[in-house]
Amino acid sequence: MRITRREFAMMTGAAVLAPSLPVRAESANIFVPGFNLPANLDPHQVLDVSETDYALNTYDHLYRWEDNPAKMRPWLAVSYTASSDGLTWDFKLRHGVKFHDGSELTAADVVYSVQRLLGLNKAPSAPFQTVLRPDSVSAPEPDLVRFKLAQPFGPFFSTIPMIAVVNPRIVKAQEKDGDWAATWLASNEAGSGAYRLIASSYVPLERAELERSADHFMGWKDNPRPIAKIDWRPAQVTSTRVLALLNGSLDMTDSNLPVDQVERIQKAPNAHIAKNPTMRLLLIRMNNTKPPFDNINARKCFAHAFNYDGFINEIVKGYATRNAAPLPNNIWGYPKDEKGYDYDLTKAKEYFDKAVAEGAPIKRPIELHVQQPLEQTVQAGQLFQSDLATVGVNLKLVSDTFANLTSVSSKPDTTPDMWIHWVSTYYVDPDNWIGQMYDSRFHGTWKASCWYTNPKVDALLRKARSLVEQEDRAPLYEEVARMIVADSPDIWIYNHIEVVGIANRVQGFRHCPVGSGGEVRWMHLTA
């Protein structure tokens, strides 16, 4: 039975009750965010928005993305030089930077951090694995870091803010059996950032307290009333977060608010909505190694069965723009003439019949994993389920978590049939999206979890990655984007307009596509 749009708009995903939130003392200089904590706290192991938010507050980087549109700002480094062939990069460090234990941060610490990042070989290292070796990073002087790339890498400078610098004296002391202290740093902190973790406060996925580092090297002149403490208490249910914001026990929500919750906040006297364009794609992954998704007609059936405009206009209420290709429509390299797949159930049925005729098991129950705490993924799944039923597809929705999905998607046989997620901005370059998602070299990472393989696509993406000049790279990304769309390995839905609920007492919020405005050092509280 089909549901009406009105009935669908009233649906919300059931969710697990979140831990109760404390009532905040309005006079306390304590900021209480409600966005998620990362699966673990190690910036060299986890790559998602939650980890980026956490690392921006507790760790430092050579350069940092700031503001919207995002711009690179010198941070630990004061300057850099690059050789004409794009292979040698020197970063000059500022003096007097201290880790949270009081020891001085030097170039050798940056070298160790890069070597640890590469050695762990987790998702944050993916952009560097083909161009950096542990011995290709050196410290010729105490304040000079040198990178010698194995080959030219166009996105290299834009990826530099992904390298969080850790304190090797702290980390090495916690190593066990050559594990790079991965277990220890998953629940501790060894940084130099504007805030430091109170380790005793940390409860995985439930709570973390951070206190201001008064002697942070950037100083606090640009914020004379900085927040003294961050009491990070995520609630697993969106409506719980919003209720906490409205009753004064929470200062900020996540940026995945469904429209009904946006409207609640807009009517509140003590909170408001911050609305910012960004570069964040919502897509549905199809496991191209699992029948029926190894059949292009089956994939095109699904691509034509999603109601893109209905979802964007009726469910998201215009807080997004249609994005028909696998990179944001507001970045260079996007093919402006690419229309992608339209919502057409007649076409979907035609492709369904072709897939059946070719022996694809498209009539079997298909599982779509949604992120239960994020209602928008549930809403998208319910809409898709309804329309696919009219075509003849039996879609089952499975509640899951991002942490689990990124883990199981490391192998094709454990990756779900389908799953829905966002791809956020970790570095501002087309490679952050199309390169990491569709070059088969990155199979085993969550970004490449559709397990798509096309040798011609691989070759073009690698060529684009090897060039330095944007004007040479952009046409290649446009070409390869069209090729990928023609193969229909995934379902690209929208580019996000981020909406965040913020208490009126919070001032100084600065949005950036990298981290979604989670950097607290700019903020202050009026009460």
Language-model segments: residues:
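N-terminal lobe/hinge region of extracytoplasmic solute-binding protein
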Residues: 33-84, 115, 190-192
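Gly/Pro-rich hinge or "lid" segments in bacterial periplasmic/extracellular proteins
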Residues: 66-68, 163-225, 229-231, 346, ...
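Ligand-site clamp/hinge motif
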Residues: 183, 216-263, 394
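Append "and occasionally in soluble cytosolic enzymes with long acidic Gly/Pro-rich linkers
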Residues: 198, 206-216, 294-386, 390-391, ...
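Ligand/substrate-recognition segments at binding pockets and active sites
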Residues: 204-206, 237, 354-425, 449, ...
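Extracytoplasmic/peripheral linker and loop segments enriched in polar/acidic and small residues
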Residues: 394-406, 435-504, 527
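Long beta-strand-rich cores associated with HINT superfamily self-processing modules
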Residues: 500-527
